[in-house]
Regions:
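Transmembrane-helix signature of polytopic, membrane-embedded enzymes
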Residues: 119-144, 163
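Membrane-interface alpha helices of multi-pass inner-membrane proteins
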Residues: 182-199
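Membrane-interface transmembrane helices that cradle and orient dolichyl/undecaprenyl
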Residues: 160-184, 220
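Transmembrane alpha-helix segments characteristic
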Residues: 135, 327-358, 407-414
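Intrinsically disordered, polar/acidic, low-complexity terminal segments
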Residues: 4, 8-131, 221-233, 247-333, ...
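Multi-pass, polyprenyl lipid-linked donor-dependent membrane glycosyltransferases
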Residues: 144-167, 197, 373
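Hydrophobic/aromatic-rich transmembrane helices and adjacent perimembrane loops
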Residues: 157-158, 357-388
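Perimembrane helix-loop-helix junctions
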Residues: 203-237, 242, 246
Length: 586
């Protein structure tokens, strides 16, 4: 059956969309194996503990109080809808590593769907919008974004910034169709919320204008449609400037109140530094850039990686092959430039920041968190380039006989990108995610629950070993207000040889079914010999395993363990070398 006949079937386009969404989600969800990164290591713990220990009514009142603090200009930055600085009900999604990542992925996919919808609407081609839907999941730098960047960090900050901008874009096009002012009002409000979430929102007026131009085919009409969105931005800008002015007055002692430190987001007009940081930030938004510069190998490839690659790439190539009517050159140029604006404009804001102009903050493979939404712009640019190549190839005499080969090569390249990123992400981060999970399970099961005022040191370093973060971890998982320290930091300090300290650690086995956590009482700056040792074997550990450990007199002990399906706590007698505790197959 010819391709044209297949694409005309009623089931073809719904099937392409379903395959793309299902396997695109599966592909991007690989980073649920990675540990938390950046400020999430502290903020997630604090906010989840807060929401689970506060009544619903009080949490609503606290949220309204935080909003009032923002709208009354008591903070140096006007970000009332930002996440995670403002406490809110979304804190319920911060407690579980996998659940948190899936929550952010839901935001990301909502943006993907809205971007595709907006492209399809602006180009007056639903098929082009579906092609955009299929391409976008492959545009993210999954390996590099897995921990410390916002595709999977910072409470979906940039995703929740982009979403109202996309709604504003759809609203102005609807206003053009109907003439109803309510759509203009909606666009204005959405841009207000966008800019009041994160400052990169101010740049989205540019792609909105570009897509409005694509829709109307006239720059003048596009300017008219952009006015409501621009007014929404102006309102936010007024609040933002007001907040900075009030903060300056408080810093000068003219007004009472605390002063916010906002030097890192105040612009620095050092042109060479701006251009260098701008270029580096833009480069980080391209999907394979970090892996190529980092010479990252894929590691072990599983059949599921190949399946995801084949299905995601297959859906994208099928959508491109079925494009029977391509945008003209002007429309395609506007689509490309709109994508370029989504890449370059947020990156320019980062380039203006004195904080990120400093060496080491941004490089050719690592950008700040806006790089995630820059990837949406890369997707629009890639779509425009592919459309241009399709138009060129379809005009050649060799196209009818060679198109199958070219589509196959394109599919192989796309699938290879997906397989490479997915396998590399698992290889790079799987052990970190396993360590975080089993360590948290052990604390939740009661390890160190009886420590009292005795200090606790942890083998797993939270937020660089910061004591506030270490304490927050025990509060979150064990409801325990512990005097917690990172073992690496503890060993650099002076401690008496007889100073008692509990050590909580973990040992990773051959796979997650052999991961364990343990706790014991040691002494001094190097608590390597422990007594009163408890070992936690979490749910999911294989039955009939063997626990190995070595005593202080170098005797290796082999102990068979029989596990409960909900997890098992085992007590060991004598003096035991902490680093010798491990679980293995029978």
């Amino acid at each position: 059956m010819k391709l044209q006949k297949i694409t005309q079937k009623r089931w073809f386009w719904p099937l392409v969309c379903a395959v793309s969404v299902v396997f695109g989600w599966w592909y991007l969800s690989i980073v649920t194996c990675a540990p938390l990164g950046g400020d999430d290591e502290l903020i997630n713990l604090q906010n989840y503990y807060y929401i689970t220990h506060t009544s619903f009514g009080q949490s609503v009142l606290d949220y309204l109080g935080d909003l009032w603090e923002q709208f009354s200009l008591q903070n140096g930055r006007f970000r009332p809808f930002s996440s995670p600085p403002v406490r809110g009900l979304t804190s319920w999604f911060l407690g579980d590593l996998v659940g948190y990542r899936l929550y952010i992925l839901a935001w990301t996919y909502a943006d993907i769907v809205l971007t595709a919808w907006l492209v399809g609407k602006a180009s007056r081609s639903k098929k082009l919008g579906i092609a955009c839907l299929c391409l976008l999941p492959m545009m993210f730098s999954v390996w590099q974004d897995s921990t410390g960047n916002s595709l999977y960090s910072y409470g979906a900050l940039v995703q929740s910034t982009l979403l109202p901008a996309l709604v504003a874009g759809l609203a102005v096009l609807r206003w053009q169709d109907t003439g109803h002012k309510r759509w203009a009002v909606l666009a204005g409000y959405c841009m207000f919320q966008c800019c009041a979430t994160f400052e990169i929102g101010f740049t989205y007026i540019v792609p909105i204008f570009g897509l409005a131009w694509l829709y109307t085919d006239k720059a003048r009409d596009a300017l008219r449609l952009s006015i409501p969105a621009l007014l929404g931005e102006c309102v936010t800008l007024a609040f933002n400037m007001g907040a900075r002015l009030m903060n300056t007055l408080r810093a000068a002692g003219i007004l009472a109140g605390s002063v916010s430190q906002i030097e890192g987001i105040s612009p620095n007009f050092d042109l060479p530094a701006i251009l260098r940081t701008w270029a580096m930030q833009m480069s980080a938004g391209f999907p394979l850039n970090a892996m190529l510069f980092g010479k990252m190998r894929p590691g072990k490839i599983y059949p599921v990686d190949v399946l995801c690659g084949v299905m995601v790439a297959g859906a994208a190539v099928a959508a491109l092959a079925a494009l029977d009517k391509l945008p003209n050159k002007k429309q395609n140029l506007l689509l490309f430039l709109s994508g370029l604006a989504m890449v370059s404009a947020p990156a320019l804001l980062i380039g203006l920041s004195p904080k990120y102009q400093q060496p080491g903050q941004v490089d050719w493979r690592h950008g700040y968190i806006p790089q995630t939404v820059e990837s949406f712009g890369v997707g629009l640019m890639a779509l425009a380039v592919l459309v241009m190549l399709l138009r060129w190839a379809r005009g050649k005499s060799w196209w009818p006989g060679g198109r199958a080969v070219l589509y196959g090569l394109l599919a192989v390249c796309m699938a290879g990108s997906v397989v490479w990123q997915r396998a590399a992400t698992r290889s790079a981060y799987d052990q970190g995610g396993r360590a975080y999970t089993v360590f948290g399970d052990g604390v939740a099961a009661g390890l160190a629950a009886d420590c009292g005022d005795t200090p606790v040191v942890t083998d797993y370093m939270i937020w660089g070993g910061h004591e506030v973060a270490e304490n927050a971890f025990f509060l979150r998982y064990g409801d325990l207000d512990a005097d917690a320290h990172a073992l690496q930091v503890w060993r650099t300090e002076d401690h008496a040889d007889d100073e008692a300290v509990y050590r909580v650690g973990f040992t990773l086995g051959q796979d997650r079914h052999y991961d364990i956590a343990w706790c014991g009482l040691g002494h001094g700056a190097d608590p390597d010999v422990l007594t009163d040792v408890e070992v936690w074997l979490p749910a999911g550990t294989f039955l009939y395993d063997v626990l190995y450990y070595t005593t202080a007199d170098d005797e290796e002990v082999r102990r068979e363990v029989y596990l409960d399906k909900n997890g098992t706590m085992i007590t060991l007698d004598g003096e035991i070398l902490a680093d010798s505790i491990r679980l293995a197959a029978h």
